[in-house]
């Protein structure tokens, strides 16, 4: 199979990496399901500059609630209509400004990239990320994805090309989208640490880019959402599907997709009015206390925040919309952490577990039902709220397929 880094264009990053150029492997095989993680970091491999585990945890902190006993749902998830077989009719595309978008027919080739990082030997070590990858890999096998068309990067492997360093990760992302055609079905799954970095382009309402954190992040840097979008979304043709799942902290807008959906199926609007209301109330209290300067500063800050938030949303819609059919499920909002949990005695990411539980029980759900069901599974144990976003407006009553 074509392999990450073999030929083709490579996105150049300011953080280094993104190249590749290593040859296709001989006898490449994925570990079996009876694997046991090594007691420490894999031995005998080197990443750029000679990788050694850092002494401090990755930025963004350790995913919360580690070791929490998270049992599978005891009964059916959601209302009875979730078990209804939906007809996946041929949906029509539309226009975003002057750009045409199309839903994928899902009849073309299938490719998947699965990344799980436990950060063995680091202070921020996680336990469930590699398990997440194995579980998602099995899920995809049952849905027509072949092992020869799946690349797995985990930090329990001995082959240097299969270690989730920054260079290997970005090269694998290029492999995923290389040669994509209308009707193709691509799948990306990341389970690991997530973080935030100061934004400079004015496209983030909170002023921060969301990041994912490679194994060698201290030497090679984090991977920001702008770069993820540039590699995996921008090159896709009209009508090509990319389904992405990010089970990591601060992952709400990890692909910088412009349309984020509520559980009722509507596009979310930034909560500007609520923020403005609170700011005006504070200014009024300052006025009542005779603090005219405080009142003026409060009003200026309030309306600046409102302007920046709506401005960031407009920039995102103008620069991040795509004719491709890109859908992302993230484990939490940008401001939240995503839990590393325990399910039936095995470590797993809470979001990955919830998604697989829902999809295995109800293979035919609409987008709206899927989002609600995943949230329902998590709601009784965690505060994190999974987010669903897309590159173009989607009909949330359509059948969700991968």
Swiss-Prot record:
Transmembrane segments: none
Keyword Transcription regulation among UniProt keywords: no
Superkingdom of origin organism: Eukaryota
Record key words, sorted: Apoptosis, Hydrolase, Protease, Thiol protease, Zymogen
Alphabetized PANTHER family for the sequence: METACASPASE-1, METACASPASE-4
Catalytic residues (positions): 193, 249
Reported function: Involved in cell death (apoptosis).
Record-level GO cellular component terms: cytoplasm
Family under the similarity heading: Belongs to the peptidase C14B family.
GO MF terms, alphabetically ordered: cysteine-type endopeptidase activity
Protein's name in the database: Metacaspase-1
Biased segments, Low complexity type: 23-45
Natural source organism: Mycosarcoma maydis (Corn smut fungus)
One Pfam family recorded for the sequence: Peptidase_C14
């Amino acid at each position: 199979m074509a392999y990450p880094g073999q030929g083709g264009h490579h996105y150049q990053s300011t953080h280094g990496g993104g190249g590749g150029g290593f040859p296709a492997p001989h006898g490449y095989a994925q570990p079996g399901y009876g694997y046991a993680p090594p007691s420490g970091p894999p031995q005998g491999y080197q990443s750029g500059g000679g990788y050694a585990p850092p002494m401090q945890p990755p930025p963004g902190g350790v995913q919360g609630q580690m070791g929490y006993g998270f049992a599978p749902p005891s009964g059916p998830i959601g209302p009875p209509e979730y078990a209804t077989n939906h007809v996946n009719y041929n949906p029509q595309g539309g226009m975003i400004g002057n750009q045409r978008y199309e839903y994928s027919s899902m009849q073309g080739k299938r490719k998947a990239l699965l990344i799980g990082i436990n950060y063995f030997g680091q202070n921020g070590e996680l336990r469930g990320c590699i398990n997440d990858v194995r579980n998602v890999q099995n899920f995809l096998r049952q849905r027509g994805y072949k092992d020869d068309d799946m690349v797995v990067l985990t930090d329990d492997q001995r082959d240097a090309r299969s270690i989730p360093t920054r260079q290997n990760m970005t090269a694998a992302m290029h492999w995923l989208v290389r040669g994509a055609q209308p009707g193709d079905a691509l799948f990306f799954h990341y389970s690991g640490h997530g973080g935030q970095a100061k934004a400079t382009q004015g496209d983030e309402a909170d002023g921060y880019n969301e990041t994912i954190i490679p194994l060698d992040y201290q030497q090679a840097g984090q991977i920001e959402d702008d770069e993820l979008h540039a590699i995996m979304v921008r090159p896709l043709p009209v009508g090509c599907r990319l389904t992405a799942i990010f089970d990591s902290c601060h992952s709400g807008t990890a692909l910088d997709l412009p349309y984020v959906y509520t559980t009722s199926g509507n596009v979310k609007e930034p909560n500007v009015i609520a923020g403005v209301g609170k700011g005006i109330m504070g200014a009024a209290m300052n006025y009542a206390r005779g603090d005219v300067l405080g009142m003026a500063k409060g009003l200026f800050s309030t309306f600046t925040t409102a302007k920046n938030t709506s401005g960031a949303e407009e920039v995102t819609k103008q620069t991040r919309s795509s004719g491709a059919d890109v859908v992302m499920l993230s484990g939490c909002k940008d401001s939240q952490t995503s839990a590393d949990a325990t399910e039936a005695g095995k470590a797993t990411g809470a979001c990955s577990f919830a998604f697989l539980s829902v999809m295995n029980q109800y293979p035919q759900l609409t987008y709206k039902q899927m989002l609600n069901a995943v949230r329902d599974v998590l709601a009784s144990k965690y505060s994190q709220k999974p987010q669903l976003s897309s590159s173009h407006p989607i009909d949330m009553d359509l059948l969700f397929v991968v």
